[in-house]
């Protein structure tokens, strides 16, 4: 069987489906509380140029979330 250690959930649809969320759950809230879904899931915004405004309004994304994601992926790949 595959050794899946992390599932990255990109965007609202994936997050609502895998996290069994109500459709009213806001993407920003889910992504901001990404630690609540670890170690199995890591919710992210879609990497689209249209999200540049969202990223500008949410500086924690680049300051906290991305370094945590990089560290986690490096840890998994080094095993």
Summary of predicted features, one role per range:
Residues 1-79:
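Glycine/proline-rich loop-helix segments at beta-alpha junctions forming the active-site rim
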């Amino acid at each position: 069987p595959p050794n899946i250690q992390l599932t990255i959930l990109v965007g609202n649809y994936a997050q609502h489906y895998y996290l069994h969320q109500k459709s009213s759950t806001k993407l920003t809230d889910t992504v901001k509380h990404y630690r609540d879904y670890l170690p199995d899931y890591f919710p992210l915004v879609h990497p689209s140029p249209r999200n540049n405004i969202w990223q500008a309004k949410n500086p924690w994304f680049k300051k906290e979330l991305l370094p945590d994601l990089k560290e986690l992926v490096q840890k998994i790949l080094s095993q």
